[in-house]
């Protein structure tokens, strides 16, 4: 929350993606706010200026990148002790010229998995986590055999799709699924119902664990897990709790009506946006959405989309 004594600014920043998958970062000068830390290039948005225009201007001024085209990725609201910042992160994949520090700042390219070892301003941490995430989270159908599941994994695109296992009990079968996913470069989410399942997830080396809304309500602290921790979010109270616990990701649902839950009220895009945009963690839109809804979902604050029927290959 801002106060009259706390300055507030709006910033737009670029996730500049090279053809090899690396991300271009710059290092803040020591004499600036949050100096000496790595950041996603960008700057302040002038009053009345469109986000895309502001980012194109900043990238040309700072890095000599001409004609940068961008699309929404994630919006974060963050309160520092001395400043309230709203950051609009945008994907940049098209530009002209080689990025270079025109203001004396250091510029360097990093692979996404290298970002976790760098020092960023605190407000950037949710987007650092979000960059590790696939655009789509494919929820495995509950009534599927192991053979069908393994065959489906072979059809997934590991660069764009992750796999969420909601139902599992046989440790050997889950180990086989995780091993095949790792061979295919597919990140795995495993449903966690308690400390034992988190320990199992650790032992299996899965990328993420996911908690239901009911389990989230019972948590008092962030579980001890080195990977991504996700939770189901259906309302503001759950989103706030997930953020306060320092979780990394939320599945916000149901965004739209679904055949699996007939008659259950859906959030709708406007209400879903209130939960997703500005959230302190990465949000996926779940429920009634399809892979083709990604651009619309990002316009409403999500970093990705998730589902069963429209996603399972």
What positions do the PLM features span?
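Active-site-adjacent beta-strand/loop module that shapes the phosphate/pyrophosphate-binding cleft
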Residues: 76-99
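Glycine-rich phosphate-binding active-site loops on the catalytic face of alpha/beta enzymes
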Residues: 209-219, 249-263, 289-313
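Nudix hydrolase/Nudix homology domain
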Residues: 100-153, 158-159
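Conserved Nudix-box catalytic region and its N-terminal flanking loop in Nudix hydrolases
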Residues: 22-62, 73, 187-191
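Glycine-rich adenosine-cofactor-binding loop
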Residues: 138, 233, 266-276, 280-293, ...
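Catalytic beta/alpha-barrel core
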Residues: 137-143, 160-222, 226-242, 251-253
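Conserved N-terminal beta-strand and adjoining loop/helix that marks the start
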Residues: 2-24, 75
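A short coil-to-beta-strand element that immediately follows conserved catalytic motifs
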Residues: 66-75, 90
């Amino acid at each position: 929350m801002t106060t009259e004594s706390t300055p507030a600014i709006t910033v737009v920043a670029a996730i500049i993606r090279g053809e090899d998958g690396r991300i271009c970062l710059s290092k803040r000068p020591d004499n600036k706010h949050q100096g000496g830390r790595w950041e996603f290039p960008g700057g302040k948005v002038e009053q009345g200026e469109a986000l895309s225009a502001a980012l194109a201007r900043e990238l040309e001024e700072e890095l000599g990148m001409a004609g940068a085209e961008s699309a929404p990725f994630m919006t974060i609201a963050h309160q520092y002790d001395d400043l309230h910042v709203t950051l609009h992160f945008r994907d940049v994949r098209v530009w002209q010229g080689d990025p270079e520090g025109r203001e004396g700042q250091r510029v360097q390219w990093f692979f996404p998995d290298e970002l976790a070892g760098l020092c960023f301003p605190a407000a950037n941490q949710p987007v650092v986590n979000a960059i590790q995430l696939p655009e789509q989270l494919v929820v495995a159908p509950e009534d599927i055999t192991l053979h069908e599941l393994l065959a489906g994994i072979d059809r997934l695109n590991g660069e764009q799709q992750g796999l969420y296992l909601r139902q599992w009990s046989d440790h050997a079968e889950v180990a086989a699924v995780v091993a095949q996913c790792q061979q295919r470069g597919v990140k795995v989410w495993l449903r966690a119902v308690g400390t034992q399942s988190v320990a199992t997830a650790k032992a299996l080396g899965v990328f993420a664990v996911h908690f239901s809304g009911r389990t989230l309500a019972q948590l008092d602290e962030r579980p001890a897990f080195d990977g991504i921790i996700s939770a189901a979010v259906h309302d503001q109270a759950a989103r706030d709790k997930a953020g306060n616990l320092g979780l990394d990701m939320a599945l916000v649902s149901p965004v739209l009506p679904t055949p699996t839950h007939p008659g259950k009220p859906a959030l709708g895009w406007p209400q879903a946006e209130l939960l997703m945009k500005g959230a302190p963690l990465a949000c996926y839109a779940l429920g009634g959405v399809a892979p083709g809804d990604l651009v619309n979902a990002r316009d409403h604050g999500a970093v990705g989309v998730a589902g069963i029927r429209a996603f399972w290959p």
